[in-house]
């Protein structure tokens, strides 16, 4: 199924690209979320009329994400206190939600879906650098310090 992308989508294409995707991906994900329209003559004309508006919206989202990335990078180490054993091993773990809540408490809004922990949840005390993906093109690093709770 051929579709016209209305947004930049990772591993697929940019705004305005006409791509061929499987019908199920288009029907169940791209079309309902408004990320694409079916590629036909009428939709192509409508898209070309709205192209400037969509590009401006995309640029605005990118600028907002860049501003948030600067705020996140400017943060000092975000401290999370958690119960831990004598050797620094946590009782439980620190996951995406915990990191997002700690950064939000520090003053910068962050959703748990934006936090990237490629090695899984944090299970030890110490200092960590956690990657945060705010936009497909914008990433930031959060300095995280996990300490033992008294």
UniProtKB/Swiss-Prot annotation:
Which InterPro entries does the UniProt record give? Ribosomal_bL9, Ribosomal_bL9/RNase_H1_N, Ribosomal_bL9_bac/chp, Ribosomal_bL9_C, Ribosomal_bL9_C_sf, Ribosomal_bL9_N, Ribosomal_bL9_N_sf
Report any one BP term from Gene Ontology.
Answer: translation
Is Transferase there in the keyword field?
A: no
**One matching Pfam family:** Ribosomal_L9_C
Which chain positions lie within coiled-coil regions?
none
User: Which UniProt keyword terms apply here?
Assistant: Ribonucleoprotein, Ribosomal protein, RNA-binding, rRNA-binding
> A single GO molecular function, which one?
structural constituent of ribosome
Is Ribonucleoprotein a UniProt keyword of this protein?
yes
Superkingdom, taxonomy of origin? Bacteria
May I have one GO cellular component term? ribosome
Report the function annotation for this chain.
Binds to the 23S rRNA.
* Family under the similarity heading: Belongs to the bacterial ribosomal protein bL9 family.
HAMAP family attached to this UniProt entry: Ribosomal_bL9
Extract the NCBIfam families matched here: L9
Q: What is this protein called?
A: Large ribosomal subunit protein bL9
Q: Which organism is it from?
A: Shewanella piezotolerans (strain WP3 / JCM 13877)
């Amino acid at each position: 199924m051929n579709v016209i992308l209305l947004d930049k989508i990772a591993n697929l294409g940019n705004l305005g690209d006409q791509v061929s995707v499987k019908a199920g991906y288009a029907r169940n994900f791209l079309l309902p979320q408004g990320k694409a329209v079916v590629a036909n003559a009428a939709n192509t004309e409508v898209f070309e009329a709205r192209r400037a508006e969509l590009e401006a919206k995309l640029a605005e989202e990118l600028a907002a994400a860049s501003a948030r990335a600067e705020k996140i990078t400017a943060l000092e180490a975000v401290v999370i206190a958690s119960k831990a054993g004598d050797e620094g091993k946590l009782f439980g773990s620190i996951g995406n939600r915990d990191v997002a809540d700690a950064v939000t408490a520090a003053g910068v809004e962050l959703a748990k879906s934006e936090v990237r922990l490629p090695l899984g949840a944090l299970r030890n005390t110490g200092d960590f650098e956690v990657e945060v993906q705010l936009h497909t093109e914008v990433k930031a690093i959060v300095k995280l310090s996990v300490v033992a709770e008294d």
